[in-house]
Every structure is written in C-alpha cells, then in structure tokens.
C-alpha cells in the first residue's frame, strides 16, 4: 500500500519518539530522516534544537535534494543531517528512512 506524506510524517515523528524512549539521543547532531512519499526528490528532517520528544508530524521540515527547505521561512536545520540526507537519499533510491547516531545502542544495531 502506498503511503501518503502524512503517514510518512507520522512515522518519522514516531521514530523520533522511539529513539527518545530508548535513550538514543545523547548528541545534538544525531538525526533521522525520511524521503517524502509525494516527491521522491524531497525529504523530511527535524528542526535543529528540538528535543526528540518534542518532534511532531507537523514540526518536520521538507527540504529538496540539495538540502534547501521548501519553505524559505523554515527554522534553522542541522547541516550535518542535511549532508547525510543528500548523500544517502540522492545515491540510494531504495532508501526511504535512515537514522544517524552515535549512541552505543545505535552502534550495536548498526553493527548487526
């Protein structure tokens, strides 16, 4: 079943909540992102400075495949996260979500 963009936003916001619940939020520059279901050349990221437990579907920001927000009034974004989004989503069309982190829990999952 194809997902609409609201579904993707809700799933990404839920992913941030799960990361928070499991303590995978120990660095400011960690991030999770999702490819938009409506435009495969855009992706969703969180606003820099928000705690993971504060992120909602409506607070996610859509950016183009060059890392530029679609809404020019968007708040500040994490440059490191945007670079990873560009590298991953522009290279791998089969990837729709990703998590970048440095906590021991994330490294354990990433290493299996």
Cite the ranges covered by each PLM segment.
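An anion-binding catalytic pocket shared by soluble metabolic enzymes
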Residues: 8-97, 106-112
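Short hydrophobic beta-strand that contains or immediately precedes a catalytic carboxylate
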Residues: 100
């Amino acid at each position: 079943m194809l997902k609409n963009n609201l579904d993707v936003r809700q799933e990404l916001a839920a992913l941030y909540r799960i990361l928070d619940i499991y303590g995978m939020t120990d660095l400011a520059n960690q991030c999770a992102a999702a490819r938009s279901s409506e435009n495969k050349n855009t992706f969703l990221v969180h606003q820099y400075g928000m705690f993971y437990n504060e992120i909602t579907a409506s607070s996610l920001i859509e950016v183009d495949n060059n890392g530029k927000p679609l809404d020019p009034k968007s708040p500040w974004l994490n440059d490191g996260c945007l670079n990873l989004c560009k590298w991953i989503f522009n290279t791998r069309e089969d990837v729709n979500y990703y998590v970048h982190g440095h906590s021991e829990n994330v490294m354990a999952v990433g290493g299996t």
